[in-house]
C-alpha cells in the first residue's frame, strides 16, 4: 500500500510504503536543506580573558559566583578573595581554534556567539576602537570560514561596559544609544564580508524583570548585592527598554541601508505559560503574563510599534515613557528580518494565591505544572511546549524563526576513563528536536537550531560551572580550578549524527 507525501505547500513529493518501519528515513527530510544546525555561546560566559589586550570591564565581569541556593552578587569594585567566574569563564579566547574544530567535527553549519562590547570599546565611550579586540574576532570568523560555518552574532549579550553603568546608569540614559551605534557601525564595517546574520540584543525582554536591570540594562548604578534583590524600579527599567528599542531599530535600519546582504534579527526569552486551570481568572492572568513577558518586546521588534495592551499597564504602574520626536518612526523603520528565541521550559499561572508550588526558571518562573518533570534546577521539561511556541510565534508574525537557545543544565559525572555518559541530555534534545520538526510539519518556517552551551560555559543566572549544558565537557569547577581541557560527551556523537542526517536520525 502506498501513501502520497506532500510538502507544506501541498506539492507532491513521492510515494512511500506505509508499512515500512523505516518510513521516517525514507521520506524527504522535514527540515530545509540549508537548515542552520549548530550551537550557541556568549562572550560573557565563555570567552574569558576579561582584561587581555586592552579589554575593559563589563557588568558580567563584576558579578561573583553563586549557586542554585546562593545568588551571585554584583559588586561595584573588585573584592579580594572573591571569585568572578566570567573573568576566565571557559577561555574561548585562548581555545578558539580547538573549539571551532570540535564544532566542525560535529558538523556545525552555524555558530552562535557574541562580540564582547568592551573588547572593542573598553569603556563604551572611546572614539577609536581597540584594534586588538577587532583582530581577535577577525581570527574567529576566519577560523569559522575555514570550516564553512556561518556565524550568528549577538551584538549585545549581557556584557554592557561597566563604565557606562557608572557614568550613565546604563540604558536608562539616552546617551548610551550613541555609544551603541558607534559600536555597531564599527563591527558592521569590519566584518561585513564575514558575518551575515546578526541579533541586536540577547533576551531583550529580560529587562521587564528586576534581575534584567543588571544583566541586560545595566541600570544599577551604585548597586551592590545579590542579583535577585535588585529593587523593582519599573519606571527605570521600561525607560531603559525604550532606549534599547530605539538603539535596536537604528542599528537595523543602518544595516539595511548600508549592508543589504545582512539579515537582522532580535532575540527574546520565550517563557511559555499555560493557565493552571480553566478558571477564567487563570486564563486572563496567563494572557496578561504572556503579553508582559513574551509578546511586548517581540511585538515592538517585529511590528515596529508599542502594542495597545501596554497602555493600561503603564498607566496602572505610573510609568511614563519619555520619547523624543521621531522615536516612533525609528521603531517602524527598524523591524527585524527574522525572529529568534530561547526556549527551555514552560510554567503555569494561577490567580489562586493558595496555589504556592512554584517552578524554577531562566530568570522567570511560575506555578509548577503537575504533568511535567523538572531538571536538577527545577526547570520544567516541556518538549511539546516548543511546538506550541513555534506555532504561536509563526501564526502571529509570519517571518522566519530560529531556536537559538535550548538545552538541559545538569550535573555531569566525569568517569575514571574520561568519558561522560549524558543520556539525560540526549533524551532532552531528542524530544525537543522531534517537536520542532512537528512544528515544521504544521507549517512553521524554521531557519535553524543552536542548542545553548554546546560546550560547557558559566551559568548566567547562577554563576556556577556545575550546571552544565554542553556536549563538550570543560575541566573547570565552581571553585575556579581546572585545566580547561575539553572532552567529548556521549551527546557529542549523538548530535553529530543528528546533524549529518538533517534531523532524520534521532535514535
What is each model feature region?
Residues 7-27:
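Short, Lys/Arg-enriched N-terminal segments with co-localized hydrophobic residues
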Residues 27-100, 104-109, 118-507:
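Non-catalytic scaffold segments within catalytic domains of secreted glycoside hydrolases
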